[in-house]
């Protein structure tokens, strides 16, 4: 299921090529914010396992579209959680992000709120809930590598917001497999953290891609940090602070779940703010319900 028909079509064609007549695949075009349509999908298929990878994820865009980010990321997740309970799903797995750790932007704060919703549901629901948090996926839509490739192909310059920026990366197969493995081993309510290995300097990545391309004279230009952007992301992979699993790359963060009443109060605050249609009001409401939501300038000042 996808809201974006072109993406759904591409996946459909890729799977048809790979599996041919053996493929039993149904495609549904639906937004998780459209409760009635989503309910029809649940009624039709009675799904056992739901993996929620739906998210507005572009940090600078979401800084100026806070209402839409909350509707899609937060209210959409809440719709899925409620329908999982109503239709007797077995497992719900949510894909989260390192940007949810002490978030400095709307995207990260909405994903932190999603984690709180999932963990709260695990305290009173029948479904086995889990969330898996990891960093950037190499080559995924909208990620930095396709951008650098286009910029190099166009003769440059390659743009880097700040030469100090460091990010965690994982390949698409690694990310997919670890998300599935996390969901499979979940008992209920876990917040899984993946060991992403050593972080990479974006400046080094840009220099290496230029060198490997063989193109001469490509300039790298610093453009300045974008709204909501951190210099460093933090995954919290500190083994002394996490519980181990049988998979050496998957850990469980210790966190306290909110009650059903507490989480619904937070959702009501966000709904009231979003009903105004004002992104600034929505952002302040988000800041009030996600205690760890910090201003990026404060965080970057600490680590600069």
Where are these regions (language model features)?
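Strand-loop microenvironment adjacent to phosphate/nucleotide-handling motifs in alpha/beta enzyme folds
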Residues: 115-304
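Hydrophobic/aromatic anchor residues within beta-strands of the central parallel beta-sheet
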Residues: 27, 69, 92, 129-132, ...
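Conserved Rossmann-fold NAD(P)-dependent oxidoreductase catalytic core, especially the SDR/UDP-sugar
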Residues: 58-59, 64-115, 120-122
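Conserved residues in the N-terminal Rossmann fold of short-chain dehydrogenase/reductase
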Residues: 28-29, 71, 162, 222
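NAD(P)H-binding glycine-rich loop region in Rossmannoid oxidoreductase-like domains
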Residues: 16, 32-71
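Conserved sequence/active-site signature of Rossmann-fold short-chain dehydrogenase/reductase
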Residues: 33, 100, 137-139
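N-terminal Rossmann/SDR dinucleotide-binding element
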Residues: 1-46, 241
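SDR active-site strand-loop-helix element
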Residues: 1, 50-54, 92-97, 132-134
């Amino acid at each position: 299921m996808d809201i974006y028909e072109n993406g759904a079509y591409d996946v459909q064609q890729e799977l048809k090529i790979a599996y041919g007549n053996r493929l039993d695949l149904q495609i549904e075009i639906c937004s998780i914010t459209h409760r009635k349509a989503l309910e029809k999908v649940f009624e039709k298929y009675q799904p056992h396992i739901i993996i929620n990878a739906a998210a507005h994820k572009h940090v600078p865009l979401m800084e100026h579209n806070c209402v839409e980010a909350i509707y899609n990321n937060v209210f959409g997740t809440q719709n899925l959680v409620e329908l999982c309970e109503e239709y007797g799903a077995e497992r719900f797995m949510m894909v989260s992000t390192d940007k949810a750790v002490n978030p400095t932007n709307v995207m990260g704060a909405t994903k932190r709120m999603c984690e709180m919703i999932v963990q709260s549901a695990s305290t009173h629901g029948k479904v086995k809930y889990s969330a898996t948090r990891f960093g950037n996926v190499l080559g995924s839509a909208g990620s930095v590598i396709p951008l650098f490739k286009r910029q190099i192909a166009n003769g440059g310059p390659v743009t880097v917001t700040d030469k100090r920026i460091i990010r965690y990366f994982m390949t698409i197969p690694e990310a997919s497999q670890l998300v599935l493995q996390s969901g499979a081993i979940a008992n209920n309510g876990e917040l899984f953290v993946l060991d992403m290995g050593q972080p990479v300097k974006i400046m080094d990545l840009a220099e290496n891609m230029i060198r490997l391309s063989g193109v001469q004279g490509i300039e790298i230009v610093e453009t300045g940090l974008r709204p909501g952007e951190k210099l460093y992301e933090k995954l919290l992979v500190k083994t002394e602070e996490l519980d181990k699993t049988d998979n050496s790359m998957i850990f469980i963060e210790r966190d306290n779940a909110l009650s059903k009443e507490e989480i619904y109060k937070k959702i009501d605050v966000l709904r009231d703010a979003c009903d105004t249609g004002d992104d600034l009001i929505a952002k302040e409401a988000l800041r009030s319900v996600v205690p760890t939501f910090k201003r990026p300038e404060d965080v970057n000042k600490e680590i600069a």
